[in-house]
């Protein structure tokens, strides 16, 4: 049984119309719980909130440097983008540099969130392609790593070297043994962990500057890339982009489906993970805003 707590309430005048339950965990640079609300031990699927972890092998393998990837591509490898031109143009160029095409993706087509792109497709009668998928940046990273490793085309399968590398990074950063996995909306495996484990992984990213190993240095590069390009991480009108801009490069925010959010706060050496029980984005957006802004202001540190 979950020990969730009320995190968000919606009121209409004097009447409370709905309440969203969930859990929040903040971990410090030792991986221990700094503060928590609800159930830190609940097992979740992080969904897209852990894309930074999945992108680590892209750098630690040498594939990123071998292909001359810059901050723009690294940010897109961690993105859940809107499918605006600001996202599609660099991913298209990235694919061309690899000598690959849309059909080499394994994420599947998806209608873009960006209204300009979506309306353009409707006007021209063109179907959405795989590049429009909000995870196509992550999959461009997978393709880059796969090409570097010389793996077979189905890089999304759980026993593929690309996914094995992502899984190893996941267990390393969460410091847990995963209990299983589900197939994410973009066809790649998404491994389970406790909410504390996910917060611990984010704290590992937040304190990466203190360490000299290759994985930690890769984490620093990913955090810096996301901070340098907040518009690429999600896009206009999205909580991640807006909150990262408001924080002025002092924190990384990453959304995941079904009410998951993560935050990396390097200055405080803190990592945050939250899960809304009913999976609603309106509640996870609001919760992330409150707890991240308070943690960034050291409110929890007094």
Tell where the protein language model's regions lie, with residue ranges.
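Beta-lactamase-like hydrolase cores
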Residues: 1-41
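Conserved active-site loop region of the serine DD-peptidase/beta-lactamase
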Residues: 203-252
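Active-site SXXK
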Residues: 46-64
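Short, Gly/Ser/Thr-enriched beta-strand-loop segments that form substrate-interacting elements
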Residues: 184, 235-274
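Active-site-proximal alpha-helical segments within enzyme catalytic domains
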Residues: 189-208, 218, 222, 260-273, ...
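Active-site-adjacent helix/loop patches that line small-molecule binding or acyl-intermediate pockets
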Residues: 1, 70-178
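C-terminal functional modules
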Residues: 279, 283-286, 293
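Conserved small/polar residues in nucleotide/adenosyl-binding loops
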Residues: 291-296, 300
């Amino acid at each position: 049984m979950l020990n969730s707590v009320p995190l968000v309430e919606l009121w209409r005048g004097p009447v409370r119309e709905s309440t969203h339950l969930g859990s929040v965990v903040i971990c410090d640079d030792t991986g221990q719980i700094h503060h928590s609300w609800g159930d830190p031990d609940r097992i979740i699927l992080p969904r897209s909130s852990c894309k930074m972890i999945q992108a680590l092998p892209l750098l630690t393998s040498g594939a990123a440097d071998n292909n001359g990837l810059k901050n723009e591509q690294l940010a897109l490898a961690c993105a859940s983008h809107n499918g605006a031109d600001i996202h599609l143009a660099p991913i298209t160029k990235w694919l061309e540099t690899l000598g690959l095409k849309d059909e080499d993706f394994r994420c599947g087509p998806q209608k873009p969130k960006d209204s300009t792109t979506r309306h353009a497709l409707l006007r021209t009668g063109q179907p959405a392609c795989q590049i429009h998928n909000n995870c196509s940046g992550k999959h461009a990273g997978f393709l880059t790593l796969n090409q570097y490793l010389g793996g077979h085309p189905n890089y999304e399968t759980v026993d593929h070297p690309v996914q094995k590398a992502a899984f190893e990074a996941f267990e390393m950063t969460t410091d847990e043994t995963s209990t299983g996995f589900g197939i994410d909306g973009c066809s790649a495996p998404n491994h389970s962990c406790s909410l504390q484990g996910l917060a611990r992984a984010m704290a590992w990213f937040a304190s990466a500057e203190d360490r000299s190993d290759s994985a930690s240095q890769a984490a620093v590069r990913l955090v810096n890339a996301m901070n340098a390009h907040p518009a690429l991480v999600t896009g206009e009108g999205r909580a991640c982009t807006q909150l990262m801009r408001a924080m002025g490069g002092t924190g990384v925010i990453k959304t995941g489906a079904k009410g998951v959010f993560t935050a990396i706060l390097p200055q405080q050496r803190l990592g945050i993970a939250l899960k809304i029980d009913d999976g609603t984005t309106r509640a996870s957006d609001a919760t992330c805003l409150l707890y991240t802004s308070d943690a960034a202001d050291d409110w929890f540190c007094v």
